[in-house]
Every structure is written in structure tokens, then in C-alpha cells.
Amino acid sequence: MAVQKRLFLLDAYALIFRGYYALIKNPRVNSKGQDTSAIMGFVNSLFDVIKREKPDHLAVAFDKGGSSERVEMYEDYKANRDETPEAIRIAVPIIQEILKAMHVPCIEIEGVEADDLIGTLAKQAEKEDYQVFMVTPDKDYAQLVSENIFMYKPARMGNGIEIWGIPEVQKRFEVER
């Protein structure tokens, strides 16, 4: 039997926010005084995945314009969220340029959130016999885990990476299949 190809799909904003807030008490600042914590955190996560996992395929999904469909269904969708910090807003185009220079595909569709893109791509790739790893700290992705779709939670605060398959999701959320 042929070895399954492995596709890694990264949730850009989940990793960018995580990188930024991980260093909130001791931000990384460049010579121009710009907070580069979000950039450093994201790039470190990306490089760790590439070095550790050597994926066959890799892509990064970005939110673009929020979920118009969800706002139509529920007017207050994400209405209580704080405004995105300026350092993150500045970091996003820089991260996209880094990804472009590395020839890493960036996926975004107006009015569609990254988690919906990743979920759709993961299910499509699974049908094509890929093993899919959704790289994110966001537990909401657990609902997508299947025989060939896994959550890949990057290392944080001295803990190693976590890969959640069906048994890990069942244990974590105390659910049965």
C-alpha cells in the first residue's frame, strides 16, 4: 500500500494571535520600535512544522472580511470581540510576504473564515486519500477530526506539540463517536 500524502493546513490568525499574546509581557521589538511578536510567533510555528513534519503539502488559510454568512444568521456574531491590536494588523501583510517568498500558498476568500476554508479543504483532501493536519490551537477544530484528519496543536509554554485524533478528542471532550 502506498504511503499517504500529508497535508498541513495552518490557521493564520489563530497562530498569529497566539504568537502575539504569548509574548505580551515581553514583546519582541525591532530597531524601528515595531512589535514583531506576532511575526516571530507565527514564523516559529511554521518553521517548526516544516522542520519536524516535512509535509508533502502545506498551505496557510486567512480570514478575509469576516463571515458574511454567520453575520446574516446572527447579527451579533463576534460583536463583543476586542479590536485587533495594531501590532497584529501590521504583522499580517508582512507574514503574507514571508509566505509568498517561501512559496507557501495563502488561501483566503472574501467573506469566508479560515476555519471554514480549512474544514472544507480537509474534507476534500481526505476524500483524495490524504492525511490532513489542521495546525491550530483552536479547539473548535476538534469537530472535524476523523480517521485521516487530525488537529495539530503547536508547542507552547514548554509543552510539546499535541496531535489530536479521534481517541484524544473523545477523551478531551468526554464524548463517544
Predicted feature descriptions by range:
Residues A2-Q4, K25-V29, A79-R177:
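Extended two-metal-dependent nuclease catalytic cores across DNA- and RNA-processing enzymes
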Residues F8, A59-F62, M134, K153:
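Structural beta-sheet core signal
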Residues D11, D56, D63, D115-D116, ...:
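Acidic side chains
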Residues D76:
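Arg/Lys-rich, often Gly-containing low-complexity segments of ribosomal proteins
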